[in-house]
Every structure is written in C-alpha cells, then in structure tokens.
Amino acid sequence: MIKTYRIYTTLLFALIQNIAMAGDLPDINLTPGSINASINQSNIQSTICVKGYTKIVRPPVYFTNSLKKKQMRDYGYADINPAHYEEDHLIPLSIGGNPSDPANLWPQARLSEWNAEKKDILEFKLYKLVCEGAVTLDDARHQISTNWIETYKRYVK
C-alpha cells in the first residue's frame, strides 16, 4: 500500500512538473501575435465592439484542435494531453487579433497559476476598456502580446 502511494505521488509530482514546463507565456519565436489588419481604432464601434463579433470570426474547432496538437509538438511540451491546454489567441479576437494565423495562436496551459481562464478575464477587461475609449486598440494589443501576465496585474488585480 505504501509502495503504491509512493508511485502515485511520484507520478503526480512528475505530471505537475511537466505541466509547469509548458510555461505561462508563449514563446515569442513561435507565437509573436498577429492582428486582423481590417480592424483599427476608427472602426472598432462597428466591428469588435458589436455584440457577437467574435462568434463571426472565430475559427472552427477542427482547425484549432489540429493546430493545438501540432503546436504542442513544436513547443516541445512534455505533457501531451490536449485537454490540459486551450488553443488561445495571444491577441484576442475581442481586440482584433488574427483569428487563424498560427502566429497568433498557442496551446496555453489550463492547469497553472496563470492559466487560460485568467487570461480570459483580462481579455474581457481589455475589450471593455478599448470599447469605452479608456485604452487605445494598439496599446491593448501591444500590452497583451508583450506580457499578458503583467497586463493582468495592471488591469485586473
């Protein structure tokens, strides 16, 4: 019984280490971010700020699931369970990120402190600030693509 417990503990520890290896920020060489060039400050009220905009431009699940598996290999993640990641847009669709350019997508860990759910909170906050005119579109895009964690700390906490 104790031996089994030790094996499970060792396996759990190894899994946690592997998940942490995914990193909380994307590799800028693989995922530098990419914008939708048709979205700019002058047209946000008729594009990204319109309810339902992201549903129109979001790529299909079969595309993102396939890309996620490829990018998990490209990133060299030790944990290769796709369910542990969300294929996330570095520059979110809600602030005019490119929907289908692999340079704007990466497999973001779900099981870390700085996970996909936290980034979603930041994405909504930036969307509101941009649409209210409190932050420019370019500034929001730059901040989230440079270091989304620091941007989260600035605007959410």
Predicted feature descriptions by range:
Residues 2-85, 94-157:
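Nuclease and nuclease-like effector domains acting on nucleic acids or nucleotide cofactors
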